[in-house]
């Protein structure tokens, strides 16, 4: 019988979650059921940190709809994952003093699924559809009259026996969320009266989010540590809170403390191969690959083949942040490493 030591050191610590890319902004199962994360959600616009311009625009639209006693115009929120689109949808409903019913487009497989959702709505309620760009064509077309005239136009039967039936709907507000604005068809996009982009967060905004959450989970972060973690969080609250939870794991299990310093954060994130820029091994491999081609533009499919990854994942998950921090540029001929990106990658080695 083999005897395995239960001692945990710095090198072994990351193995428990090595399959998870911590800097991926998409939600993971752990985050869907984490009660602390639910407690961290703001209850109103005042508690929502960041997105000041967006909140101001929405505040005016909401107050105007309340003043006129009309439903808020259908609203489209777009931006990278993890920036708060779902949270904003719930806050909009809260400000309107109504319920928010939530659905995801992939789960709306058949026309009758969207019909059921629409018929279940009450006057003034909010219907939130996440990943709305993934609605199939038939389902999307049913939304046209529902959004425009608050009615459903249904075709009953087939061939010569087919007949049309119109069902009036209560006045409601549809809030759609998407990470791929260009993938939404023009007829659907044009039916949203309000369209707002959710931007990446500033370091100061992320720092405040981190400080607030650290109090909920009984961690002590000094001012420098909270700002340092904010800089690593890729402008995304979801990533900031995820990294903070992993730092907590390291602090409590390896260092036996609830006091978080800059040095402890560096050690914890190094165990997951995350560096001071918030980049992980996949980001660095991408940049290394470009650096090997000596300022020659490379097509996305060629990069994906070279790295053994999916091109769509690279385009929508890896590249946006590399572009944001000035390490990557897209050209008609392909992807190019910038001078800043080259300086960064030259300072690293392949065995980070």
UniProtKB/Swiss-Prot annotation:
InterPro entries per record: AAA+_ATPase, AAA_lid_4, DNA_helicase_Holl-junc_RuvB, P-loop_NTPase, RuvB-like_N, RuvB_C, WH-like_DNA-bd_sf, WH_DNA-bd_sf
Binding-site residues for DNA, renumbered to this chain: 330, 335
Pfam family, one: AAA_lid_4
Organism for this UniProt entry: Prochlorococcus marinus (strain MIT 9215)
Quaternary structure, from the entry: Homohexamer. Forms an RuvA(8)-RuvB(12)-Holliday junction (HJ) complex. HJ DNA is sandwiched between 2 RuvA tetramers; dsDNA enters through RuvA and exits via RuvB. An RuvB hexamer assembles on each DNA strand where it exits the tetramer. Each RuvB hexamer is contacted by two RuvA subunits (via domain III) on 2 adjacent RuvB subunits; this complex drives branch migration. In the full resolvosome a probable DNA-RuvA(4)-RuvB(12)-RuvC(2) complex forms which resolves the HJ.
Single GO cellular component term: cytoplasm
EC class name: hydrolase
Family: Belongs to the RuvB family.
Residues that bind ATP: 41, 82, 85-87, 148-150, 191, 201, 238
Cellular compartment(s): Cytoplasm
Example of a GO biological process term: DNA repair
Name of the gene: ruvB
Entry note about domains: Has 3 domains, the large (RuvB-L) and small ATPase (RuvB-S) domains and the C-terminal head (RuvB-H) domain. The head domain binds DNA, while the ATPase domains jointly bind ATP, ADP or are empty depending on the state of the subunit in the translocation cycle. During a single DNA translocation step the structure of each domain remains the same, but their relative positions change.
Keywords: ATP-binding, Cytoplasm, DNA damage, DNA recombination, DNA repair, DNA-binding, Hydrolase, Nucleotide-binding
General function of this protein: The RuvA-RuvB-RuvC complex processes Holliday junction (HJ) DNA during genetic recombination and DNA repair, while the RuvA-RuvB complex plays an important role in the rescue of blocked DNA replication forks via replication fork reversal (RFR). RuvA specifically binds to HJ cruciform DNA, conferring on it an open structure. The RuvB hexamer acts as an ATP-dependent pump, pulling dsDNA into and through the RuvAB complex. RuvB forms 2 homohexamers on either side of HJ DNA bound by 1 or 2 RuvA tetramers; 4 subunits per hexamer contact DNA at a time.
Residue ranges, annotated region (Head domain (RuvB-H)): 276-352
GO terms for MF: ATP binding; ATP hydrolysis activity; four-way junction DNA binding; four-way junction helicase activity
Protein name as catalogued: Holliday junction branch migration complex subunit RuvB
Reaction catalyzed: ATP + H2O = ADP + phosphate + H(+)
Region of interest (Small ATPAse domain (RuvB-S)), residue spans: 202-273
Annotated EC: 3.6.4.-
Residues reported in the UniProt entry to bind Mg(2+): 86
Keyword check for Cytoplasm: yes
Region (Large ATPase domain (RuvB-L)): 13-201
């Amino acid at each position: 019988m083999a005897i395995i030591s239960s001692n945990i050191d710095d090198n072994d610590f990351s193995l428990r979650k090595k399959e998870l890319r911590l800097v991926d902004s998409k939600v993971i199962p752990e985050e869907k059921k984490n009660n602390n994360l639910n407690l961290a959600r703001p209850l109103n616009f005042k508690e929502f940190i960041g997105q000041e311009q967006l909140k101001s625009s929405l505040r005016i639209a909401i107050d105007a709809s309340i003043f006129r006693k009309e439903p808020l115009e259908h609203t489209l929120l777009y931006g990278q994952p993890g920036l708060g689109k779902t949270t904003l949808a719930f806050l909009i409903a809260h400000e309107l003093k109504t319920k928010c019913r939530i659905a995801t487009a992939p789960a709306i497989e058949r026309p009758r699924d969207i019909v059921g959702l629409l018929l279940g709505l009450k006057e003034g309620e909010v219907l939130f559809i996440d990943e709305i760009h993934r609605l199939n064509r038939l389902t999307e077309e049913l939304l046209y009259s529902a959004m425009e005239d608050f009615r459903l136009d249904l075709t009953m039967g087939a061939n010569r026996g087919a007949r049309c039936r119109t069902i009036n709907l209560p006045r409601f507000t549809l809030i759609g969320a998407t990470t791929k604005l260009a993938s939404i068809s023009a007829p659907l996009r044009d039916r949203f009266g309000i369209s707002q982009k959710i931007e990446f967060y500033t370091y100061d905004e992320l720092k405040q989010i981190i400080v607030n959450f650290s109090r909920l989970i009984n961690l002590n972060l000094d001012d420098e540590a909270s700002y340092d973690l904010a800089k690593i969080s890729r402008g995304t609250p979801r990533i900031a809170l995820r990294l903070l939870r992993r730092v907590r794991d390291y602090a409590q299990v390896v260092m036996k403390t609830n006091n978080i310093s800059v040095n402890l954060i560096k050690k914890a994130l190094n165990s997951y191969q995350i560096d001071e820029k918030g980049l992980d091994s996949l980001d660095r491999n991408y940049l290394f690959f470009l650096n090997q081609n000596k300022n020659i533009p490379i097509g996305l499919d060629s990069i994906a083949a070279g790295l053994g990854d999916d091109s769509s994942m690279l385009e929508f998950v890896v590249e946006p942040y590399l572009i944001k921090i000035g390490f990557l540029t897209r050209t008609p001929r392909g992807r190019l490493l910038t001078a800043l990106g080259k300086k960064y990658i030259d300072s690293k080695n392949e065995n980070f």
